[in-house]
Amino acid sequence: MAAALTVASVGLSSCVGDLDVENINPQKTSTTEYDYILNKVYANLVLTGQKGPDGEGDLDDIDEGTSSMIRQLWNANSLTTDEAKCIWGDEGIPEFNRNNWSDAHPMMKALYYRLYFGVTLSNYYLENVKGDDNETLTMRAEARFMRAMFMYYLMDLYGNVPVKTSVSSEATPQSSRSEVFAFVEKELKDIVGDGEGNEVLADKRATYGRADKVAGWILLSRLYLNAEVYTGSAQWQKAKDYADKAIKGGYSLCTEGKNGYSAYQLLFMGDNDTNGAQNEIVLPAIHDGMETQTWGGCLFIIAASNSSSKTDVNLGTSEKWGGNRVTKQFAEKFITDEAAVKDLVEPSEVAKAAGDDRALFSCAKHTISMEDESDFYSGYAYNKFTNIHSDGTQPKHTQFVDTDFPMIRLAEAYLNYAEADARLNGNRCSADGLAKIKDLRKRAHASEPSAFTLEEVCDEWAREFGFECMRRTTLIRFGKFGGDSNYYWQWKGGSVNGKQIDSKYNLFAIPNSVVSETIKQNPGY
């Protein structure tokens, strides 16, 4: 929580014209304030400005409430897929739901600027903090890790983007997706000790919320798992090797429940920094109801998935926005008997009936099929994230949440390993890959299979990582998103039963506000 991450008090803002930081004078910035700037790099995952939920936003000409990185990562990776749809009519939401966005999409513009704001903060820190002592070298490695992660998301979402490594008003030329991949790969390999230089991450974080080698290994594994999409050349063995390093890196799956909550529930609760989940959460985006107030982050995920009008699910916050619910295709990856859950309100009861601790739906008054785009009760609510504290203590704030968002957790290494293993073994997991699947399903009290195919791995990604900003990337990797795919979900392409969408949607449009002679638009937009 916020005790582990002091938010920068230095005046920071961004100019959306050149995406550089203004109002930082190096001659007036103390060493302590540079530490605050590194903290601001981390806080960029959650916060949007200098005054809590709104006021003095980081980004010019962007609605602050829509500029939260996690909120827009979630929208881009959930609403566009078989996971969820939102009933709101806010500009950009219907376009996400129906897969028909343009280069004027306001939320993808906000996310583009938010990610580059993180890159610029990282660059500013790296340009001004020098030294060869171990602490400085490690902190510089952390700033490079965060910059690499921001660049990874830019590459994943937008494809060909500029690689910015300095704070400058000069225009940075556009790089190809393969070139961005090579940059991210080299940066990550350097800072985990597999490349050049002596700026290396700690073997294991000393402070919760800081990046370490395991975070670097998992992000490398993710990078290699998607290498075929990003570069045209598969790198399954490297994905598997770095996943294996991470699995053996000193973290552990959260497998013990507490006070009536399942181990899986603990990962997404208001005290997930102390309840045992912290041993699995490798890199959290830290939240604190008093200190990190935002309309994005985990508050958005929790509040938008709950409503006070018909159901009464206590999720630990007074905010109940009634927006997001899941498609039939997502629910049916857990629910095989609709009649057994149709009258159940509490997600834990649904999970028990479904035989999978991850089936954290609220079903009463809802229909499993999303026939009506505008009705919150058309489609199940998915209440995986909560602000409830497992030890029975009260949240720090009645409105804003304490729940940390797991940007990277160890379970990803298990699924990366299993998927890469299946792809290396004729689309079926070997005994080693199957063991990783069994570990996750055993934790969820789900049936343990005797065999697992690559197609089943795709569904397991949905079960394990629903609402964690993973689904769009997964579907593209499996050839189930844009282009010649026969995998449909409700409202894909604007049809209630789903239909194919153009392959151009495998990338988002570069915001039209930055397209220029040096930054070209993606094909089809």
PLM features per residue range, with description:
Residues T31, D35, N39, A43-G49, ...:
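Conserved, well-structured interaction surfaces
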Residues C15-M69, T518-Y525:
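Membrane-proximal, proline-rich intrinsically disordered regions
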Residues W88-A110, A331-R409:
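Flexible, polar/acidic helix-loop-strand segments at domain edges
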Residues S9-L12:
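Bacterial Sec-type N-terminal signal peptides, specifically the leucine/valine-rich hydrophobic h-region
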Residues G52, S252-Y377:
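Extended ligand-binding clefts on enzyme/binding-domain cores
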